[in-house]
Regions:
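Short acidic DE-rich linear segments
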Residues: 2-3, 77-82
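Short, charge/polar-rich alpha-helical segments
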Residues: 1-28
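Short, charge-rich amphipathic interface segments used for partner binding and complex assembly
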Residues: 34-76
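Alpha-helical coiled-coil oligomerization motifs
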Residues: 24-27, 31, 35-38, 79
Length: 82
């Protein structure tokens, strides 16, 4: 099982990195000088908050990050000595 968990974590990291790139690309179509930090705080940019595509892609990223947190918590619960 640890091998499966490790490969799952690698795939999830790849998905997160891909989605972060995608969210930044969409953000830069709306706010050309947007930075990775800016997309973590979109409320500072009304045009981002109002854009449905940005919110959709950001929601996917949020889901991946939530899954990553859940997997890490489960790993710690299953293996408290790690």
């Amino acid at each position: 099982m640890p091998e499966n968990r490790h490969s799952t974590e690698i795939i999830l990291l790849e998905l997160i990195e891909h989605q972060q790139t995608k969210v930044l690309k969409v953000a830069r179509e709306i706010v050309p000088n947007a930075t990775p930090e800016d997309i973590r705080n979109p409320q500072d940019f009304p045009d981002l908050v109002a854009d449905t595509l940005f919110n959709y892609e950001d929601g996917i990223l949020t889901g991946y990050l939530t899954l990553q947190t859940a997997i890490r918590k489960q790993t710690r619960t299953d293996n408290p000595d790690l």
